[in-house]
Amino acid sequence: MLCVTLLVGCVDHTSRGYLEELSGKELSRVYPTENIEDLFEQFPNGFTVSQMRVVGDSNVFVYLEAREKGKPLVGTIKQLNSKTKEEEKSITFQYVDGKFVFENEEEAKKLWPQGKFLFQELQLNKDILAKAKLRENIYTKKEESPTGDNTFYLKYSIQLPVVSRILGIDESQPVELFIFGRDESDGFVYEIGTEQDNQTTLWEMIREIRK
């Protein structure tokens, strides 16, 4: 019993193995989930989803809020100028019976051509992360973290055809994928995204609503 206790106490929370075990297990709860309403099985009190994609000189933000199972999920698509941050376009939508219903479908398809969140198609788990090439691993203790939590940042070079299609690049070309999460935190809060030349090109965050 003493040996087991000592071994557990010696777990290195900053190691790749520990962080991939943690993040892989958590992310696999969500990635993939084709029907957004199924996320209520994981987060019964509700959840929010945010996504950002760089399009030329603009950033396209998609935000969805889900607070009660069985009711339409509501969201917005906004295009902002990346330099001035001024809003250029805004479209509201609902997610009902497994489908997006847009205020202006034609304009929505221009702003959000993939018409889906990453988590609806992308598969992420411990095994996938373990096989990828790790480029960076940063662990920040809560005393030094602006969120007040123990946080971690993992960056990989990995082939993800789903992401490549959204970015409009060759599917065989690796992308720089990053994962930002919290260690020993209440509730699900994860961010994933891609970078090119140290600039974020695609980003998504899922946050569990806690009561």
Regions found by a protein language model. Name each.
Residues 169-211:
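Acidic, serine/threonine-rich low-complexity disordered tracts
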Residues 41-47, 65-74, 94-99, 149, ...:
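Short, solvent-exposed coil/turn segments at beta-strand boundaries
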Residues 7-52:
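N-terminal leader/targeting segments and the immediate start of mature chains
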Residues 1-6:
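Bacterial N-terminal signal peptides
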Residues 52-57, 82, 159, 193-201:
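Hydrophobic lipid-interacting interfaces of membrane-associated proteins
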